[in-house]
Amino acid sequence: MIKKLMTAAALLTMVGTASSATLYTTGVLDFNKTTKGSYLGKIGAAVPVTVLKKQGSLSYVRISGWTLAEYPSMIFAEPDAAEYFGKNCEWIAPKPGTDVAMMIAMAHELESSGKVDREFIRKYTVGYDKFIAYVLGKTDGVAKTPAWAEKICGVKADAIKRLAHLMREKRSMLMGGWGIQRAQHGEQVHWMMVVLAAMCGHIGQPGGGFGFSYHYSNGGAATSMAPALGGISANPKGGSEGLSWVGESLATIPLARFTDCFLNPGKTIDYNGKKITYPDIRLVFWSGGNPFAQQEDTNGLIKAWKRPETTIVCDTVWTASARFADIVLPACTSLERVDITSIGSYSNLGYVAMQQAIEPQYESHSDFWIYRELSKKMGFEKEFTEGLDEMGWIRRFYENAAKEARVNGLEMPSFEEFWARGYVLFPVDQDARRYNYLGDFRRNPIVNPLGTESGKIEIFSKKIESYKYDDCPAHPTWMEPTEWLGAKMAEEYPFALLTSKSRYRLHSQLDSTASNLFANVEDREPVWIHPDAAKKLGLKSGDVAKVTSRRGSALAGVIVTDRIRPDTVVIHHGGWYSPEEPGEEGSLDVHGCNNVLTIDIPSSKLSCGNVANSTQVKIERWDDELEPIMAHVQPKTERADD
């Protein structure tokens, strides 16, 4: 079936992520719907064969088999060639952070050659006239031609022209990951991707258009008929806080700006059309994350982490973040407690009874037990538990879902039967198998409007225009990042750093396990470097290099590969921070934590997202003694009851 559906298809990839649903909405493509003769365009940074396999995904099985097939002719346009299997693949490697310039030039080519689908633009979009005036240079005197883009992105003008015509001549599908939105001006990539798809006119057709959500949880698989599982109430009964506080409080801040918040209480910033004033954070309770792996500029974070009076981390292992905490609450792993989960957040193909395999080890407790005890100390245990224990909550989630399913004509087994069997599977609705993203919108945009102010695809946004942001104009625009290969600083820091996901981890999870032994070089996180660059630096695979940015330095094991641009390196995200001098700002990280290197500025005033992929570094051979990796060794602690 895969061969039949994918014959003569092509995969065009650029690198990206969805950021602003107010402009165009996001969606998931069912891989079964990709039609014969289509160009399936993946605007990447979420490689399905890397990220979906971590979910045990049916989509991964389809994709890996599909990419191994001889039929698709795939064109990937991104700085690093990740796990691509098709022997007919073509790789185009733009400079990191320049995808917008390349796509704008493709738009220029379509417009100047008369290939734009005018009827689609007229019927389904707003603001094209203002955008195309910018593209043609009528607003700033600079025509955004393929030759113009070549000087920025490093891709030949003829290749840009060819890509534009390939996309237009056959039905094209552009797939977007969640990667290069993590860059300065990151919103522009996906906005421009949608504009390009609109110019081609394939949106809403089977196998055509765009989509963004393929990075996990069965993205690309058809959705079942089952309802989603609920969760513990965010707004406790009898209480006035909870969800309402989170939604309305002026103390809510963009997560990526928390370091700035800690360092600058009282500072006012722009965020998504509003002004936000940072609160004075005096206590931090961090659960379910690892900021010393995920937050940019680790040395800046060390300074910020010292500002609150108390920091508490609740986790299952001694992460880098737990090592910086004043108090650590040891939580159970999923093997030591009960729970319930769905099979695929997108596809929801079934529920699994997560039954306890072993008793809680040592002094650990379940998250529910920890929060219940904290609630008891604070005087609202009854409001938190609502009279239920853990199994009571699981039963409530399941039985509420069963009631909703019954309304929709789907009978589920009793909770007792479900728990004894361990799982329940749901049929996939036939309409879901035939689902065509934005097909209803294409058939009738008046009856089926988008969730934008105009109800259409907003190539130009009046709302964003009203914000008057200097870093996020009202239509897709090429803007130079602070750090990139075209900046003056690249003379001293000549390599662009990419922080892609590792195939051996899930974010920073599993870094302390045997899985990472397959990836590490001399116990260090690897740095991918091109053979030409390695030769100039006197490096070979198996060496250790010191990688330095304006913010810090980290050691990394060298892997020489031609799957990267000569002016670009990759250190995968998630290596645990292991400093030479623990707790000291500016200490050399000896393990390869890439966020020691990255810059901590907002992607723009619109989203205030992180910019992990907008960093320049320099590299030198490391011949000194290698310090042991202490990130995976239990630190010295004091018991709270001693």
Question: How does the language model describe each region?
Answer:
Residues 15-18:
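N-terminal signal peptide c-region/cleavage motif recognized by signal peptidases
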Residues 33-45:
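SH3/SH3-like (including bacterial SH3b) beta-barrel domains
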